[in-house]
Amino acid sequence: MPIGNLGHNPNVNNSIPPAPPLPSQTDGAGGRGQLINSTGPLGSRALFTPVRNSMADSGDNRASDVPGLPVNPMRLAASEITLNDGFEVLHDHGPLDTLNRQIGSSVFRVETQEDGKHIAVGQRNGVETSVVLSDQEYARLQSIDPEGKDKFVFTGGRGGAGHAMVTVASDITEARQRILELLEPKGTGESKGAGESKGVGELRESNSGAENTTETQTSTSTSSLRSDPKLWLALGTVATGLIGLAATGIVQALALTPEPDSPTTTDPDAAASATETATRDQLTKEAFQNPDNQKVNIDELGNAIPSGVLKDDVVANIEEQAKAAGEEAKQQAIENNAQAQKKYDEQQAKRQEELKVSSGAGYGLSGALILGGGIGVAVTAALHRKNQPVEQTTTTTTTTTTTSARTVENKPANNTPAQGNVDTPGSEDTMESRRSSMASTSSTFFDTSSIGTVQNPYADVKTSLHDSQVPTSNSNTSVQNMGNTDSVVYSTIQHPPRDTTDNGARLLGNPSAGIQSTYARLALSGGLRHDMGGLTGGSNSAVNTSNNPPAPGSHRFV
């Protein structure tokens, strides 16, 4: 029995039964003691269906007898299925795999170019890498990024078989990335070459030492007064007070009790007189309508003719009624005047009360807000000027040490070369060379202005009594004048007695012609004896210092 229409035979109506998933597509489900079969829970067709509906799958639905089942099972690899808002990146040398190999577990972003291509851009160690994403990978990234941040992160080998997982970059990840960028070392300062120092006076030398080049990077976080929130709070308070003033004025003009008109008063006497006259005229008119109220005249024929004059009693009655009406009108006028004044007083009192309340609440509060806001602005400005931000300075110091040889140029003051030759030791000892150079310099420099203040440099110079060249017969040997006209600097060389522990010789005398004469006489006389560091070479001088260097200590001349 055929298991299904594998060959697309139209004569076979059998459908394809659900097949078990491939082992690589179950994420190790088969190793958990659950048998994979076509009817079990792990053999459900849902394992073959991606969690999301991708565009790549929808285009291939017609290629299968079962709708929704893709043709190539590799389409359902682990990287296709999202789990916990992430998916695996297979080692398939695809764009995401290539980007992961370049930047590792770092953040990358997705951008869309003008031509419609989607690229993923990541950075590591200052090198930016970008790859062009396929439509399927871009769809995967969109499926796990519903908010559209377009920022993702590789979370290392957390997937199956060491695959990296791709998840949406959280705020913590972005903060970590920014911290790492801030912690990257900026450039160091430029160091200058050493050996550029110049000599001082007649002694020119290239100093041996260190040069410090300091590069100072200053970042000052300054903020203007307008960026201070307290200033805007104070200005807002002032604005609120101004608005309160305007609102109070509008309310008082529209909503309060209007200003009452002046009360209309009527003169009671005028009202009484007018009423009395009107009543008299009205009653008189009515009385003339009745002929009985008129007096009658009898003519010659004896006929009664109305005379047009009211009877006296009728006139008296009319006058009485007119006075009564006038009195009543007077009283009514008095009462009306009193009511009008009362109404005016009540309305005026009510308005004043409303004005008092509204002014106290509106103008008072608004004025307080304006005053407080003004004080706040002044205080904020003062504090801003007082509390200026401190500059944050980062100093990078680069030290370059260069050792150079010392070059000494001797220039005697009298332009006269020193008598004799100076024996300097070899170059194997730097300190010895320096001492010899300084001795040579000292031998050619002298100051005639300080002869009287020069201390005796030979007071403690010692010599050995075992030297065969030292005469022992005479303890006091005179220094002969060698034909020089200069005065003798030291008259004698005194040797100590043999029973004393001090075996050194002592020069006696006072300096009178300067150190230069002493050097000249010592040079002419053959110099000092052995163990005293002879200065010049001669037949009677000590052994050359290049062959027999002087001993350190008090036996050194210099």
UniProtKB/Swiss-Prot annotation:
- Motif window: Essential for actin pedestal formation: 456-458
Topological domain ranges for the Extracellular compartment: 252-362
Its annotated compartments are: Secreted; Host cell membrane
Q: Would the keyword Transmembrane helix be found if you checked this record's keyword annotation? A: yes
Null mutant phenotype: Mutants show reduced bacterial adherence to host cells, and a loss of actin condensation beneath bacteria.
Composition bias, Low complexity = 213-224, 257-277, 393-403, 436-450
Region feature (Disordered): 1-44, 182-226, 257-280, 388-451, 533-558
Tell me which parts of the chain lie in the Cytoplasmic compartment. 1-230, 384-558
Residue spans with biased composition (Polar residues)? 404-424, 538-548
- Quote the annotated effect of N456A: Strong decrease in pedestal formation. Does not affect translocation into the host cell and ability to bind intimin
Which controlled-vocabulary keywords does the entry list?
Host cell membrane, Host membrane, Membrane, Phosphoprotein, Receptor, Secreted, Transmembrane, Transmembrane helix, Virulence
Major localization class: secreted
**Effect listed in the UniProt record for changing K462A:** Does not affect translocation into the host cell, ability to bind intimin and pedestal formation
Q: Which GO terms describe its cellular component?
A: extracellular region; host cell plasma membrane; membrane
Record field: transmembrane: 231-251, 363-383
Mode of membrane association: Multi-pass membrane protein
Fetch the InterPro entries from UniProt.
Tir_central_sf, Transloc_intimin_rcpt, Transloc_intimin_rcpt_C, Transloc_intimin_rcpt_cen_dom, Transloc_intimin_rcpt_N
Q: What is the effect of changing Q455A?
A: Does not affect translocation into the host cell, ability to bind intimin and pedestal formation
Free-text comment about domains = The intracellular N-terminal region contributes to the initiation of actin assembly and influences pedestal length. The central extracellular region is involved in bacterial intimin binding. The intracellular C-terminal region is required for initiation of actin pedestal formation.
Query: Belongs to which family?
Result: Belongs to the Tir receptor family.
- Describe the subunit structure: Interacts with intimin. Interacts with host BAIAP2 and BAIAP2L1.
Name the UniProt record assigns to this protein:
Translocated intimin receptor Tir
Q: Which organism is it from?
A: Escherichia coli O157:H7
